[in-house]
Amino acid sequence: MANSLAIENVGEAQIITAEIWQSASSADIMLTMLLESRLFLTSSHHTPQLYLFAASCARRVNHLLQDPRSHEAIRAAELFATNASSSQHLLHSHLSARTAAFDLATTYNSHPLISTDQPNDDDHRSIPQVTLLGGALIHAAATASMACCPSEILNPLRAAETSARYAIKALYYEQLTNDTDSTLISQLLEEEQHRQSQALRIFLGNPFDSKRWPPFTITNNADIDNRVTACTTQQ
């Protein structure tokens, strides 16, 4: 009797978790769910889809990427996800893109330090515009670098989570650079979080109920291009 109740409780918890995943409007919530799932964190089953998700986040800040090495990193992640390139190429692209991000950091090093936390809305106007721009460009470059981070350096799930977080920060600093109204900034970031949540569902399906919502099956580059385009242009 006790065993049957335990099984029933586990089943109910699984259903609730799957429903939370399907309805979540924030990628933060969904990625936290995955990070807290020990089984998922140690599994390589969704690795290709995680690279595609990270690449889609990086493409959202494509307009802020100034170095060809950053653009190459995004494509390297997409190619690796389809077994169209080697792990050595992925590593080389990551290291090159990371160097590009470091180069940007060096360029803006003479300006006031850029905090990894989002500045207070009342404080950002006292920060030089060039510093805010540097924050946008550096976080965008870091997004691209993390999108193709090899698993031997960082777990693909953690790398994807970092890419998503850096992309949000890049867009945030971009809006501060443009002196956008704080209310509008909050709205834009909420929309970006929702867009990322949709991208996770597109690529990963529902890891907590994969029979009903299986992950995206990668067949060719055209499929990838279509999915990535959908993730980067959806409203």
Regions from the language model: what does each represent?
Residues 1-235:
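Structured binding/interaction patches within domain cores
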